[in-house]
């Protein structure tokens, strides 16, 4: 079976977890890991897995892109550098899957809008944030039943699972997540809050989703819609589960979720890594299947 070759930029928590998932993919083959620190743990681990590495950033990868047939790149660095990375790689015809909150390209939350991206020939799609991937499906589950005037999501993650890149991007995280709660989740107004909890032992990712419906909530239909959506998410993140809810209080619908990871890199408490990396891998696989079938040919993009 032909596989589409990929590069990963950023050998931190997210990049390392993603590498483990891509290694199992039937249509994607990770061939490069890009970092900026020669001593990086993530680069060392990638080399042990037989992946080529460079510590010279994206510029260290560019000369090899065409020779090694790289067609998809995952950016797990920081919102500040993503635009430059994307420009350089898009110019060589490489499609970007953006795991930073840069959000240059359209938002992608697989169970809600993955299919919409097919056939649009986008060269950059944004995976929102871990908080977005965990909560937007729930907002969408309510908004597909009836209009949501306001949605507020709170993502609580363990301190140990949040690396330096994510910490530098907290403001971008909240802005990008709130934007996608509106655009993909379907809420008229969205708000996002992230809590980084330093407790030891580290706690599992928890997410609270509040939706205010415009009219009295149709409890039965909303409950059915939420359960159906949870099953969709579980297809690629089996540790996604409902802890409580939906709880109805007037026009407010509240759902409490917990996300356990597969333990590919950090232990299972780091469900925030899994929901992000599994969504990114799922998205890339869909594009890869189209390329293998001959329905999608990537063209260089001149910025």
UniProtKB/Swiss-Prot annotation:
Residues annotated as catalytic: 130 (acyl-thioester intermediate)
Reaction(s) catalysed (UniProt annotation): acetaldehyde + NAD(+) + CoA = acetyl-CoA + NADH + H(+)
Domain of life: Bacteria
UniProt EC number: 1.2.1.10
Keywords, in A-Z order: Aromatic hydrocarbons catabolism, NAD, Oxidoreductase, Plasmid
One Pfam match: AcetDehyd-dimer
Top EC category: oxidoreductase
GO biological process, one term: catabolic process
Binding positions (NAD(+)): 161-169, 272
Gene Ontology MF term list: acetaldehyde dehydrogenase (acetylating) activity; NAD binding
InterPro entries: Acetaldehyde_dehydrogenase, Acetylaldehyde_DH_C, NAD(P)-bd_dom_sf, Semialdehyde_DH_NAD-bd
The family this protein is said to belong to: Belongs to the acetaldehyde dehydrogenase family.
Protein name per its UniProtKB record: Acetaldehyde dehydrogenase 2
Record lineage: Bacteria, Pseudomonadati, Pseudomonadota, Betaproteobacteria, Burkholderiales
């Amino acid at each position: 079976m032909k596989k589409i070759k990929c590069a990963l930029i950023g050998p931190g928590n997210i990049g390392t977890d993603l590498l483990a998932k891509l290694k199992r993919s039937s249509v994607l083959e990770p061939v490069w890991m890009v970092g900026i620190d020669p001593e990086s743990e993530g680069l060392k681990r990638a080399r042990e897995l037989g992946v080529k590495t460079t510590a010279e950033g994206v510029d260290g990868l560019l000369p090899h892109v065409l020779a090694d047939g790289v067609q998809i790149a995952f950016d797990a660095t920081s919102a500040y550098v993503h635009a430059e990375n994307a420009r350089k790689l898009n110019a060589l015809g490489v499609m970007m899957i953006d795991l930073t909150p840069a959000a240059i390209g359209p938002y992608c939350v697989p169970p809600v809008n993955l299919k919409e991206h097919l056939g649009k020939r986008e060269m950059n799609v944004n995976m929102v944030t871990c908080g977005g991937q965990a909560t937007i499906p729930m907002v969408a589950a309510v908004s597909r039943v009836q209009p949501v005037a306001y949605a507020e999501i709170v993502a609580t993650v363990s301190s140990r699972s949040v690396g330096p890149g994510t910490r530098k991007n907290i403001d971008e995280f909240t802005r990008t997540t709130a934007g996608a709660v509106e655009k993909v989740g379907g809420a008229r107004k969205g708000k996002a809050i992230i809590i980084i909890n330093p407790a030891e032992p580290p706690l599992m990712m928890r997410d609270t989703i509040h939706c205010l419906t415009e009219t009295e909530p149709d409890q039965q239909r909303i409950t059915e819609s939420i359960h159906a959506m949870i099953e969709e998410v579980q297809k690629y993140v089996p540790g996604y589960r409902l802890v409580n809810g939906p709880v109805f209080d007037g026009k407010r619908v509240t759902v409490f979720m917990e996300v356990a990871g597969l333990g590919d890199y950090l232990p299972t408490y780091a469900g925030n890594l899994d929901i992000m990396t599994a969504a990114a891998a799922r998205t890339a696989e869909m594009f890869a299947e189209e390329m293998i079938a001959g329905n999608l040919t990537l063209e260089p993009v001149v910025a």
